[in-house]
Amino acid sequence: MASGRDPREARPGELEIWDLSREPWDEWLRDMLEDINQEAKMHFGRELLFQVWNYCQEEGERNRTPMLERAYKYYKLVQKALFVHFRCGCRRRQPFEPYEERRDGQGGGRAGRVPPGLD
């Protein structure tokens, strides 16, 4: 403190996720989707994840959003849901059991493409 410098780390400027120079954006996003889907399957179940994926796809088709932006929107929604789930206290000790699946086999989340990591 004697030097007059602020001991806190300086806040970075406006940095967007696509500004990071790790690997191509689509490869990074695909890897992150696979990772987050593996974790989300244990807490939410596949059917709910399919429904969120289909919501993002349908919303993107209505707005003519590119596929990568739709996938990124799905990633952000699942990431926020996991954050809230853990923040509220996850009490799950075993992987998710699909106890609420429809018995006639007509689940609402299987139309269209499959999110990466859920095939």
Curated annotation (Swiss-Prot):
Belongs to the lentivirus VPX protein family. InterPro entries: Lentiviral_Vpx_assoc_factor, RetroV_VpR/X. Pfam families: VPR. This is Protein Vpx. Interacts with the P6 region of unprocessed GAG. Interacts with host VPRBP/DCAF1, leading to change substrate specificity of the CUL4A-DDB1 E3 ligase complex. This is an African green monkey isolate. It comes from Simian immunodeficiency virus agm.vervet (isolate AGM3). It is found in: Virion; Host nucleus. GO terms for cellular component: host cell nucleus; virion component. Keywords: Host nucleus, Host-virus interaction, Inhibition of host innate immune response by virus, Viral immunoevasion, Virion. Plays a role in nuclear translocation of the viral pre-integration complex (PIC), thus is required for the virus to infect non-dividing cells. Targets specific host proteins for degradation by the 26S proteasome. Acts by associating with the cellular CUL4A-DDB1 E3 ligase complex through direct interaction with host VPRPB/DCAF-1. This change in the E3 ligase substrate specificity results in the degradation of host SAMHD1. In turn, SAMHD1 depletion allows viral replication in host myeloid cells by preventing SAMHD1-mediated hydrolysis of intracellular dNTPs necessary for reverse transcription. The keyword rRNA-binding does not apply. GO terms for biological process: symbiont-mediated suppression of host innate immune response; viral life cycle. The keyword Metal-binding does not apply. Its main location: virion.
